[in-house]
Amino acid sequence: MVNMKASMFLTFAGLVLLFVVSYASESEEKEFPKEMLSSIFAVDNDFKQEERDCAGYMRECKEKLCCSGYVCSSRWKWCVLPAPWRR
């Protein structure tokens, strides 16, 4: 009976230790993806979108004219692709 209690205690202690170790390693790993994503999606001045004289797809067309290949939606006031069913 004592042997069974000791083995259950050791098993439980081992599971607790495994949980603590995995939690510690996971908390360290959580910072890595955040740092990696922030470096990937960092906005660089060379890659910023240039200001256009026309509005592109799904851009507001109240003040600007739509770029070639797009028309201003009369309902939503966005630049959309022209289609036969749109008036």
Curated annotation (Swiss-Prot):
UniProt signal peptide: 1-24
User: What are the GO MF terms of this UniProt record?
Assistant: ion channel inhibitor activity; toxin activity
Q: Where in the cell is it found?
A: Secreted
Question: Which GO cellular component does the record give, naming just one?
Answer: extracellular region
**Family annotation (InterPro entries):** Huwentoxin-1 (IPR011696), Huwentoxin_CS1 (IPR013140)
From what superkingdom does this record's organism come?
Answer: Eukaryota
Which cysteine-cysteine pairs are annotated as disulfide bonds in the entry?
A: C54-C67, C61-C72, C66-C79
Q: Which Pfam families match?
A: Toxin_12
Protein keywords: Disulfide bond, Ion channel impairing toxin, Knottin, Secreted, Signal, Toxin
Query: Where primarily located?
Result: secreted
Reported tissue expression: Expressed by the venom gland.
Propeptide residues are 25-52
Q: Which family does it belong to?
A: Belongs to the neurotoxin 10 (Hwtx-1) family. 51 (Hntx-8) subfamily. Hntx-8 sub-subfamily.
Q: What does the UniProt function comment say about this protein?
A: Ion channel inhibitor.
Entry note about domains: The presence of a 'disulfide through disulfide knot' structurally defines this protein as a knottin.
Put simply, this protein is called: U3-theraphotoxin-Hhn1a 7
Q: Which organism is it from?
A: Cyriopagopus hainanus (Chinese bird spider)
